[in-house]
UniProtKB/Swiss-Prot annotation:
Protein's name in the database: Lactamase-like protein nscB
Active site: 122 (proton donor/acceptor)
E.C. code: 3.1.-.-
TM segment ranges: none
Coiled coil: none
Cofactor notes: Binds 2 Zn(2+) ions per subunit.
General function of this protein: Lactamase-like protein; part of the gene cluster that mediates the biosynthesis of neosartoricin B, a prenylated anthracenone that probably exhibits T-cell antiproliferative activity, suggestive of a physiological role as an immunosuppressive agent. The non-reducing polyketide synthase nscA probably synthesizes and cyclizes the decaketide backbone. The hydrolase nscB then mediates the product release through hydrolysis followed by spontaneous decarboxylation. The prenyltransferase nscD catalyzes the addition of the dimethylallyl group to the aromatic C5.
GO MF assignments: hydrolase activity; metal ion binding
Enzyme class, first EC level, given as a word: hydrolase
Binding residues annotated for Zn(2+) 1, in chain numbering: 118, 120
Pathway where it operates: Secondary metabolite biosynthesis
Gene3D superfamilies registered for this protein in UniProt: Ribonuclease Z/Hydroxyacylglutathione hydrolase-like, Winged helix-like DNA-binding domain superfamily/Winged helix DNA-binding domain
Cited CDD domains: LACTB2-like_MBL-fold
């Protein structure tokens, strides 16, 4: 859909830097349950929390690996690029392949499947190192919208080893190809980047993301194993928190548009000018803020909310220059006959 704005990675890295110091320390390798071992990717940072969580799943010699780690200098938030454009020409961080290969060797384990939650480099970047270490895994890499040489994952597909039955669940929104994985023996869900152990995630498509959160909740899983952060002990509660957070942003947006439109009839911005521009929305919601903050942080986030509401036919917009586009709340009677919303 046209008009969406990419998130600016460097800005968000600086903006989120402060939360690193408040995160709990996670062990490099941890048995988080009797059938799940978490191995950190060695890439802690503002965008990755304590680092990418990779998981070995099963109880026998043969295990399932969920996610690899990070490509060197990978850009986590290049959400505007399609999966097919991401070329893994660089090897991953050496600390991750060292950790996992040592663990596999020490415990006499082998991998039967390598499942990738989505295409972002902090989840797929370790694949070249893994194949260099174990060439026999070349036909065991699985990803939705697979890269060359990889196998596809379909919604509902089952992967089984001794002690673990893992079912793939298609959950787009954070990325177009995002998959979660349900561990049936534990009624647990590997949540990928859709739900994190700390804070909130970002969405490439907010409408699909909200739908996916609902799909995840409908599974009724009690435990969440996120791709970043600590184990989620109460996944239903966390999912409700995520959905309420997003819904709160939608209510705030609708309230702002409705209020400003009503005031516009008295001569302020609003209906008299055919709605509010993005900059006017920012001022109405947050007051005067630096333009850099608007362009690099608030605008992309608020546009996701606006497009979601437009798809729900709760707001409309005047077609034209995306930067000058005017948005307005729809009243109930206009929702089914308004022009200017995405189909």
């Amino acid at each position: 859909m046209g008009g969406r704005m990419p998130f600016n990675q460097s800005f968000w890295e600086e903006f989120l830097m402060g939360r690193e110091g408040r995160l709990p320390t996670l062990p490099e390798i941890s048995h988080v349950s009797k059938r799940v071992v978490r191995i950190l990717g060695g890439n802690p940072g503002s965008m990755h929390l304590q680092g990418t969580n990779t998981y070995l799943v099963g109880t026998g010699r043969s295990r399932i690996l969920i996610d690899t780690a990070q490509v060197k200098q990978a850009s986590f938030l290049r959400l505007q690029r399609a999966p097919s454009q991401l070329i893994h020409s660089k090897k991953g961080l050496p600390v991750w392949i060292s950790r996992i290969s040592s663990f596999l060797r020490t415990h006499n384990l082998e991998l039967s499947y390598v499942l990738l939650t989505h295409w972002h480099g902090d989840h797929t970047g370790g694949v070249p190192d893994l194949l260099a270490h174990s060439p026999s895994l070349a036909d065991k890499i699985y990803k939705n919208c697979p890269d060359a040489g990889q196998n596809p994952i379909t919604d509902g597909q089952i992967f089984s080893v001794n002690g673990a039955t893992v079912r793939a669940v298609f959950t787009p929104g954070h990325s177009v190809d995002h998959m979660c994985f349900q561990l049936e023996e534990e009624n647990a869900l590997f949540t990928g980047d859709n739900v994190l152990g700390h804070g909130f995630s970002v969405a490439q498509d907010l409408g699909r993301y909200m739908h996916s959160l609902g799909d995840m909740a409908s599974l009724g899983c009690g435990i969440g194993y996120p791709a970043h952060g600590a184990v989620i002990g109460n996944l239903p509660e966390k999912l409700e928190e995520y959905m309420k957070h997003r819904e709160g942003r939608e209510r705030m947006m609708l309230s702002t548009l409705t209020r400003e439109q009503a005031q516009g009839e008295g001569g302020r911005v609003g209906e008299t000018k055919g709605g509010l521009t993005l900059n006017e929305i920012v001022i109405a919601m947050y007051g005067r803020v630096p333009q850099e903050v608007v362009e690099k942080a608030l605008a992309p986030s608020l546009l996701q909310v606006l497009w979601k509401l437009a798809e729900d036919r709760r707001v409309g917009f005047k077609p034209g220059d995306p930067l000058k586009r005017r948005w307005f709340a729809l009243d109930q009677r206009k929702r089914n006959r308004v022009r200017g919303y995405p189909s």
